[in-house]
């Protein structure tokens, strides 16, 4: 087992095109969001395994000897396995969480224990570890925060247990694992996501593992070969939404008006495919006119999503504010509030960007400038992380 400190990060995700249509067998494009979750793992010898999640105020510790003495045969040794309902109940006993524990805390702890016990039980003795996870991603905003958490845990635990090698060499600031190792990280992260979401699609953990852009179609996930990093504004309207109700609303509208809604879904599919083609071209040789196409696709998709009934007054306001400044926006994810993205073309002056952010903030929204198409799960040297991240991991 490794004895050094590991620093791992993984990105969030946004849906670029295809939300809601994907439920009806159409293509969706998901891209990594360069708001990241950071994990620090420190092996120690105090006989405890500590988990600290400062974003949601969690600090938990378990006695390694007690975990070691448990009958963990309910966790099948060998390949990556899917957690069963019996395993979940057993893990709840192991976790020792109070009955009034918040759902977010319970799920985060169960995912951690499942991955820790499943990955580390092949060791002669369960390792004594101190793990801190801090995220730039707001939870529950549809930005893949739970997947980034699961990916960071899987990567760090597999590395510390030497199931996969540490790719960080002397002198490296940051590095990534091989394709084969990333596949194993992704498989375990998917099981962590299952602990949290029950029946996830696998898109969020795949985007967080691989980075860049992915295409999702009828259960099949594939990476776009070359996708450019694009600058965006990510705006959180802070309007809560009920994803299940929004998905049901689209289904009901499709049943009520099949000849109207089915062509809308087909058209959204065509938007996703055209965007995929343009991103491929941009990866080889970016040109200004390609940004114009991306902007048109954003506008068309936003109108289609409004026609499906998943818009919201807050999202209309976001689009109006940015359109007044010559920028193009759409909702991302379930709609009905939540988040929206605004494409920032190269050459846009920083004062213009700041003025747009200010205008959106004055609407009561949270607005961040970031990029999409960021690298997937990565391992960092201590000196390469900025002081803000270091302080957050130190609990300062």
From Swiss-Prot:
Residue sites binding Mg(2+) per the record: 146, 193
Domain of life: Eukaryota
UniProt keyword annotations, A-Z: ATP-binding, Cataract, Cholesterol biosynthesis, Cholesterol metabolism, Cytoplasm, Disease variant, Kinase, Lipid biosynthesis, Lipid metabolism, Magnesium, Metal-binding, Nucleotide-binding, Peroxisome, Steroid biosynthesis, Steroid metabolism, Sterol biosynthesis, Sterol metabolism, Transferase
Binding site residues for ATP: 13, 55, 135, 140-146
UniProt effect for mutating residue 196 to A: No effect on kinase activity. Approximately 2- and 3-fold decrease affinities for ATP and mevalonate, respectively
Places the protein is found: Cytoplasm; Peroxisome
Regulation affecting activity: Farnesyl pyrophosphate and geranyl pyrophosphate inhibit mevalonate kinase activity by binding competitively at the ATP-binding sites.
Keyword Lipid metabolism tagged: yes
CC annotations in GO: cytosol; intracellular membrane-bounded organelle; peroxisome
The protein's enzyme class: transferase
Pathway terms, separated by semicolons: Isoprenoid biosynthesis; isopentenyl diphosphate biosynthesis via mevalonate pathway; isopentenyl diphosphate from (R)-mevalonate: step 1/3
Sample GO molecular function, one term: magnesium ion binding
Pfam families referenced in this protein's UniProt entry, alphabetically: GHMP_kinases_C (PF08544), GHMP_kinases_N (PF00288)
InterPro entries reported in the protein's UniProt record: GHMP_kinase_C_dom, GHMP_kinase_C_sf, GHMP_kinase_N_dom, GHMP_knse_ATP-bd_CS, Mev_gal_kin, Ribosomal_Su5_D2-typ_SF, Ribsml_uS5_D2-typ_fold_subgr
GO biological process: cholesterol biosynthetic process; isopentenyl diphosphate biosynthetic process, mevalonate pathway; isoprenoid biosynthetic process; negative regulation of inflammatory response
Predominant localisation class: cytoplasm
Cofactors: Mg(2+)
Active site: 146 (proton donor), 204 (proton acceptor)
EC number per UniProt: 2.7.1.36
Phenotype when changing residue 204 to N: No change in protein stability. Loss of kinase activity. Normal affinities for ATP and mevalonate
Effect of residue 377 to I: In HIDS; most frequent mutation
Homology family: Belongs to the GHMP kinase family. Mevalonate kinase subfamily.
Disease cited in the entry: Mevalonic aciduria: Accumulation of mevalonic acid which causes a variety of symptoms such as psychomotor retardation, dysmorphic features, cataracts, hepatosplenomegaly, lymphadenopathy, anemia, hypotonia, myopathy, and ataxia.
Function: Catalyzes the phosphorylation of mevalonate to mevalonate 5-phosphate, a key step in isoprenoid and cholesterol biosynthesis.
Self-association and partners: Homodimer.
Name of the protein in question: Mevalonate kinase
Source organism per UniProt: Homo sapiens
Gene behind the chain: MVK
């Amino acid at each position: 087992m490794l004895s050094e400190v590991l620093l791992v990060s993984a990105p969030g995700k946004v849906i670029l095109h295809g939300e809601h249509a994907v439920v009806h067998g159409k293509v969706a494009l998901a891209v990594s969001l360069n708001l990241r979750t950071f994990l620090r793992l420190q092996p120690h010898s105090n006989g405890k395994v500590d988990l600290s999640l400062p974003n949601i105020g969690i600090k938990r510790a378990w006695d390694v000897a007690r975990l070691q003495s448990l009958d963990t045969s309910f966790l099948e040794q060998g390949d990556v396995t899917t957690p069963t309902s019996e395993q979940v109940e057993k893990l709840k006993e192991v976790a020792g969480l109070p009955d009034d524990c918040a759902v977010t805390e319970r799920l985060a702890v169960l995912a951690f224990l499942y991955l820790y016990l499943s990955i580390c039980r092949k060791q002669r003795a369960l390792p004594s570890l101190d793990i801190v996870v801090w995220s730039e991603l707001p939870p529950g905003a549809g930005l893949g925060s739970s997947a980034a958490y699961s990916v960071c845990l899987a990567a760090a635990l597999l590395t510390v247990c030497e199931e996969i090698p540490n790719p960080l060499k002397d002198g490296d600031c940051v590095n990534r694992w091989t394709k084969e190792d990333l596949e194993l990280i992704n498989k375990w992260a998917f099981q962590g996501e299952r602990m949290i979401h029950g029946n996830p699609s696998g898109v969020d953990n795949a985007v967080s593992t691989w980075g860049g852009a992915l295409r999702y179609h009828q259960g099949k996930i594939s990476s776009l070969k070359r996708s450019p990093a694009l600058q965006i504004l990510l705006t959180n309207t802070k309007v809560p939404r009920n994803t299940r109700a929004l998905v049901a609303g689209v289904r009901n509208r499709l049943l009520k008006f099949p000849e109207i809604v089915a062509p809308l879904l087909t058209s959204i599919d065509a938007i996703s495919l055209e965007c995929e083609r343009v991103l491929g071209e941009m990866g080889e040789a970016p040109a200004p006119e390609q940004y114009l196409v991306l902007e048109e696709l954003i506008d068309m998709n936003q109108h289609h999503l409004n026609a499906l009934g998943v818009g919201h007054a807050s999202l209309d306001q976001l689009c109006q504010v940015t359109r007044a400044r010559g920028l193009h926006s759409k909702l991302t994810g379930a709609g009905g509030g939540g988040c929206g993205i605004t494409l920032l073309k190269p050459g846009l002056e920083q004062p213009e960007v700041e003025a747009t952010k200010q205008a959106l903030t004055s609407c009561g929204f949270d607005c961040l400038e970031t990029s999409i198409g960021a690298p997937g799960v990565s391992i960092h040297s201590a000196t390469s992380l900025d002081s803000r991240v270091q302080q957050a991991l130190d609990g300062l």
